[in-house]
Amino acid sequence: MKRAIILVLDSFGIGAAGDADKFGDVGSDTMGHIAEQCDKGLADNGNRKGSLTLPNLSKLGLAMAGKESTGKFSAGLDANAEIIGAYGHAAELSSGKDTPSGHWEIAGVPVLFDWGYFTDKENSFPKELTDRILERANLPGYLGNCHASGTQVLDDLGEEHMKTGMPIFYTSADSVFQIACHEETFGLDNLLTLCQIAREELEDYNIGRVIARPFIGPGKGQFERTGNRRDLSVEPPAATILQKLVDEKGGQVHSIGKISDIYAGCGITKKTKATGIPALFDATKEAIEQAGDNTIVFTNFVDFDSAYGHRRDVAGYAAALEYFDGRLPEIMDMLQEDDILILTADHGCDPTWPGTDHTREHIPVLVYGHKVPAGSLGRRDTFADIGQTLAEYFETSDMEYGKSFL
């Protein structure tokens, strides 16, 4: 029986990519800089202290993959761990350093076209676009229209939004149109309807995602984003390994978290919503228990990116990694004879880096299974090597990009 479990540690890069200069990211290193700060005692909080401790990920080769990526071991990680899995690092072919590009490339379909972006920091959106959205949604106006941090924009505009009923429109360096609205005063259903309108109106702009950002709270300093985020993505430009498994093998793909949204539902046969790393772990375990032959269980752990990377919270990121590492054996112990477990990322988001955006980095490729030989996979030229490996594993037709490392 063949089953693959893919765990994406969203934003967990392991060193600047060779083309990082094109993105202003030379020297970025999400893992390395977190480990360095921890080792210096600069990432202590109520949940953790001291050096970054990831014994289970190190056994799977994480520390070695980081060394192969950057030329040096990350501070404090166990460089002498007994390696029980295959490990490597992968560079990105895709033109961007965003979530859809990274995930699609992991599934064998790199994004070789250029996304559309809203590059102006203020007055970011064309008036004709916002006019059409407001007219269709029957709204009197909007707030924002700028590049913004998702939490800061709530403090800046949340109270005015609650008073006026006008949605908050904002963007970032990614190919996104984000809409923040209060779940209680504006309504979650109204927000999702508004986002669908925006998705349709953005078709000519080649924008990757419209993101619904619902929040709650009584006022400034007390607003919190909820777990009802929704990503409305465009469809991948070609069949991913997910789609091929379903179409060619009658297989199953169980999405946990926001995976289904990222692939616009393409190739997804079942989806489970879960919020927060503990709940995502629990949902993943339940999916593995239920998984039959020719099944992919695919989980995105978004909190590494959204709660810690973008917010430049080194201590929070480190604590989340250590929690993840502590629970990893629960999944490893569930693997059957022919199963494979793949741990990877979709881009970097170095919490020590200037600004709040993603960073162009190599991603880890850690593979574990009873029949997977331990050792180095070396440098992979594209994330699509993962998709091609899955194509060989499940015996589907080949992907156009990538080389299998089986």
From Swiss-Prot:
A Pfam entry, by short name: Metalloenzyme
Database matches in Gene3D superfamilies: Alkaline Phosphatase, subunit A, Phosphopentomutase
CC cofactor: Mn(2+)
GO cellular component, one term: cytosol
Cofactor note: Binds 2 manganese ions.
Binding site for Mn(2+) 2: 305, 310, 358
Gene Ontology BP, a term: metabolic compound salvage
Pathway recorded for this protein: Carbohydrate degradation; 2-deoxy-D-ribose 1-phosphate degradation; D-glyceraldehyde 3-phosphate and acetaldehyde from 2-deoxy-alpha-D-ribose 1-phosphate: step 1/2
InterPro entries: Alkaline_phosphatase_core_sf, DeoB, Metalloenzyme, Phosphopentomutase_DeoB_cap_sf
Keywords for the protein's UniProt record, in alphabetical order: Cytoplasm, Isomerase, Manganese, Metal-binding
Family affiliation: Belongs to the phosphopentomutase family.
Function statement: Isomerase that catalyzes the conversion of deoxy-ribose 1-phosphate (dRib-1-P) and ribose 1-phosphate (Rib-1-P) to deoxy-ribose 5-phosphate (dRib-5-P) and ribose 5-phosphate (Rib-5-P), respectively.
Designated name of the protein: Phosphopentomutase
Lineage of producing organism: Bacteria, Pseudomonadati, Pseudomonadota, Gammaproteobacteria, Vibrionales
Name of encoding gene: deoB
